[in-house]
Design a protein with these regions (language model features):
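Bacterial N-terminal signal peptides
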Residues: 6-16
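Positively charged n-region of N-terminal signal peptides that target proteins for export
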Residues: 1-4
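Asp-box/BNR beta-propeller blade signature and adjacent active/binding-site loops
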Residues: 22-160
Length: 160
């Protein structure tokens, strides 16, 4: 029995089945205070048809609050997440909220579709839910046909 275990061990070594332990590494894609933003929240990540990682986030300009000037940004990685591009602005609507990024990749065409929300920057969540806000929360769609390097103009689809 002892000989069988020793033989199996050497067979495994020779076949390459025994591998060294993998070292896990982490990378902070978005950091507080980076690129002129106070805070980044609500991340979403997808892999494009070309293999590029796209990390979306809400970029909160003045604070980590859910109201005020919130932009949608994306960072790209073409090396499996080892390095990341600077933030690319997907949608900036001044002092309003552009948020809740929900990316989808069309595996046939390669188009990256981004569903997101918009509301007035001065409207608070409770007001929106209670229907006492100045405006409502709306749903928009944007897309990229060049692997997330640039984005279409947002199109409202709330009633669709």
């Amino acid at each position: 029995m002892k000989n069988i275990i020793v033989i199996c061990f050497f067979v495994l070594i020779q076949s390459g089945i025994l591998v060294q332990a993998q070292t896990n590494t982490t990378t902070d894609i978005y950091q507080q205070g980076q690129d002129g933003y106070a805070c980044f929240r609500i991340p979403a990540i997808v892999q494009s048809k070309a293999g590029t990682l796209l990390a979306f986030a809400e970029a909160r300009k003045k604070s980590c609050s859910d109201t005020g000037n919130i932009d949608l940004v994306v960072k790209r990685s073409e090396d499996g997440g080892k390095t990341w591009s600077h933030a690319i602005t997907v949608w900036d609507d001044g002092d309003n909220v552009c948020g809740n990024p929900s990316p989808i990749v069309d595996q046939e065409t390669g188009r990256i579709i981004l569903i997101c929300c918009w509301n007035l920057g001065e409207d608070h969540e409770k007001q929106i839910i209670d229907k006492t806000s100045k405006d409502s929360r709306r749903v928009y769609v944007l897309y990229s046909d060049n692997d997330g390097k640039s984005w279409s103009t947002p199109k409202e689809i709330t009633s669709s």
